[in-house]
Amino acid sequence: MKRKLLMLTALALCLALLCGCTTIATSEWMQNLFPVGDEAVAAQQTGSVNGSEDKQEVKQVVTETYTALESFGLAYQPDYGLQPYNCQSLNNRIIFSFLYEPLFAVTSSYEAEPILAESYFVTDDGRTTTVKLRSGVTFHDGSALTAADAAYSIESAAGSEYYGSRLRFITSAEAQDDLTLVLSTSEAYECLPLLLDIPIIKSGTKDEVSPPGTGPYEFAETKLTRCENWWRDTAPLVDFDEIALTVSSTAADVRDNFEYQKVNMVL
């Protein structure tokens, strides 16, 4: 039952990842996934059936208690790679939540929450959005995050099949200075920050096996290792020195590794 609950929770994460969400979405599901101490979970939902207005109550109660994990593992499908803008493996996209962070994340109330960004301003005509980045943010290699990196990431994402549709109205992404990004759109787009929950990578690295990000972990072939110089002064929500990556080439491999508890989340 516990592992079914983990899978259901992972599916919730999947929906966020498909939209590009990372940090805030990750925060919400992680808090539910890793409770402190023994805990039982009960959930109740009310919804319509077959589109009708009649609502039926659906109850699901998990009676098993469990404790926090002593180790953590993820499924890894190496054939799909870890390029955040083109990777089509949903399991690999879970890994991105540990490697990368966005300019903004979308909250449960559908508001843009600054992550790597500090603030933003939209002109009266809605066609220019200026984003001010946080200072002191660094990539895994120790280099500082700049507006040029953010512009490169947005341009790379806009040219990809995965993110191209959502970013199609952006006509230019330019660094005004080291911490100021200016985005122009072909039409009024006052809510553009809601679409900027995409992974930010270091400029010029999109074709690398695992482009440097700003997240709490970095890729090390068979595992993720904690970034010792992570720019935040708080511990990550998934707080392990290492996260094992178990090669799972096929859907059957993913299923088996999950059932045998080699990995803790699958999609």
Kindly give the residue locations of the regions a language model identified:
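Aromatic- and charge-enriched surface segment that lines or borders ligand/interaction sites
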Residues: 118-161, 259
